């Protein structure tokens, strides 16, 4: 445990502090007979005081000093003795076994340094004076007065005397022949080894402390003014600042930046004696915290500025979006606007109505007329009434079935004479069930992956509903139905798909909007006396894997692991629509009720398809459907149907679709041969299948075309080539046309604008269409595919009718099979 004298020295309270400040320089020598080692303290914590208050001189020994008697030598009066005694002490310290080799080397070097310094002093060098000047500046810089310095010097001298006495005591013990001393040396060997280790650890700690204090001292010096004497001021800023240099930045020393120069002229940019920087530097002035470099502070300023800009942008965007939503809401609620925004057609029927008449729960849904593309010919009075789970919103409460399309057909409220009078009808394909070749514009501008309604609506995402509703409202209008009646048409086949009624939430199709347009189309047919054939064109899972089923690719309806699930969903679809169309308002107009379009029975299990057909027919009849039930031949040879479903439900119609362009044996026939083929082959085939005794029974042709090439864009799927020009299959350039051997087959003329068609070409097209009409009228009649297209004129009944290559009246053709085939003049065979 430290003695009280050491404690007083540690805290600077020794009585020597009161002595006179003018004293001769003295050194204290320990008596030679002092060998007291009771002062040894092996506890490092008790010795820690030796380095808390000051740094040890490099020549100090780590041995402990004694507090026994010592003699005083006046170094000014006896300098020679002082020097000789000092040298002898250093020699004894080097020879002491308690001194480490590294310590001996340092002592030797240090002693040499002292000798060199004394030599320089004796030679009258200026080094001592310079040394004193440096010490004076250091004392002044640290704020130490003379009294503190003298006090520190006394403590330093006392420590040196005590250490020297301990070294002499250790040396005396090891040199003595006295047994007690020898045994004490042996007994204390472990203590000496431990002492050496402690000395080395203290050396390392002192070195680290010295480095730390030196670093702190350098930092303090950087913060002190570099200019002494005459005060300096900053130069004024130039009128023109060099390019790239900041006008507001001041580069100066720490003294000027602190603003303590009385004559300093400085612009305020954080400089001067401003509180923020002053507090920062006052904290740093004691070495307790490093000064953050300017570039790091600048970096944080930049980060803060960027974060602020981002926050501002987010706020602005949020405000704009909020305002847009509010604007849309305000527009929707404007009862006198007649429309929700600039999108859409005629909404004049909303004029004078209050949007609040629509319940909040229905606003923004398919039941809200303010969200519709147009309100033309819709009843906009809100109702949540449903039939079969399907909404009647948009329907008028009254109807008129007294209209006939022409004088040859009875009005709607009179039975149509099926079997004795042929059906002359058209399809409105591509309206409610999209097909890429009918409306290629809807599929343009995308990658080849957009090939059907499924992929198109997936691509359109949230925009799909608006895009498709605009198509529903504009592709075929009321005028089209008026034209149909004018052209002698009496039936309309309406393709639509299951997503008009019950799509799944995970399917991308536009749900239920097409249902409202289906109801409007039926009302247009009613208005012009046109009877309706309902055609479910796309069914859950796809019944044929073709693009017009909604999803091109795999057949999952009645096929695969989920085949039965999809079949059940299709029955649920019929459960709903059969109940709805069993209402009295539809009994006169919907005279043919289709079950499913073109199930691909060449791949499907025929027995499963037949069983499903029976189940579906019985279901819809049970729900009140009295119309004829149409089912498709599944692409099977018609002769196979002579024995299938003969004993099925009553009132069934077999639906067959006949095209020559998909049969490579028929597409290669020349113009005249094609007319002959229809009259010679199809007339007999259709007549036979329509007979209950020789064929199946009542048969209709639900689809056919006058086109004798497959040249229409996207007809064979999006982006695929044609058989006609030999581009249908990759790696196979075989052409299928009458001039294939000459390789002159061309699609250019067939795809040209109808105004460019020659009279001979128009005559052929008209004759070819009328021959097919005649063949199908040998059964129950026909439905042309289709009424309207964007750019495939030979597939558009309307285009042919308006351009002279369809009969002016469907019921009054110019050609019948059995008539002489007219001459087509010089019509080339390559188109």
UniProtKB/Swiss-Prot annotation:
Topology, Cytoplasmic side: 1-300
Root EC class: hydrolase
Residues modified by glycosylation: 379, 396, 547, 611, 637, 670, 690
Keyword Glycoprotein: yes
GO BP, sorted A to Z: cell wall organization; glucan catabolic process
UniProt-recorded Gene Ontology molecular function terms: glucan exo-1,3-beta-glucosidase activity
InterPro entries listed in its UniProt record: Glyco_hydro_5 (IPR001547), Glycoside_hydrolase_SF (IPR017853), Glycosyl_hydrolase_5 (IPR050386)
Disulfide bonds: none
E.C. number(s) listed in UniProt: 3.2.1.58
Compositionally biased region (Acidic residues): 32-41
Low complexity bias (residue ranges): 178-195, 334-350
Active site: 598 (proton donor), 703 (nucleophile)
Ranges of the Extracellular topological domain: 322-831
GO cellular component, one term: plasma membrane
Any single Pfam family the record assigns to this protein: Cellulase
Topology with respect to the bilayer: Single-pass type II membrane protein
Positions of the UniProt region annotated as Disordered: 1-246, 261-288, 325-360
Reactions accelerated catalytically: Successive hydrolysis of beta-D-glucose units from the non-reducing ends of (1->3)-beta-D-glucans, releasing alpha-glucose
Compartment annotation: Cell membrane
Family: Belongs to the glycosyl hydrolase 5 (cellulase A) family.
PANTHER family: GLUCAN 1,3-BETA-GLUCOSIDASE 2, GLUCAN ENDO-1,6-BETA-GLUCOSIDASE B
Function noted in UniProt: Glucosidase involved in the degradation of cellulosic biomass. Active on lichenan.
Protein's name according to its UniProt entry: Glucan 1,3-beta-glucosidase D
Organism of this sequence: Emericella nidulans (strain FGSC A4 / ATCC 38163 / CBS 112.46 / NRRL 194 / M139) (Aspergillus nidulans)
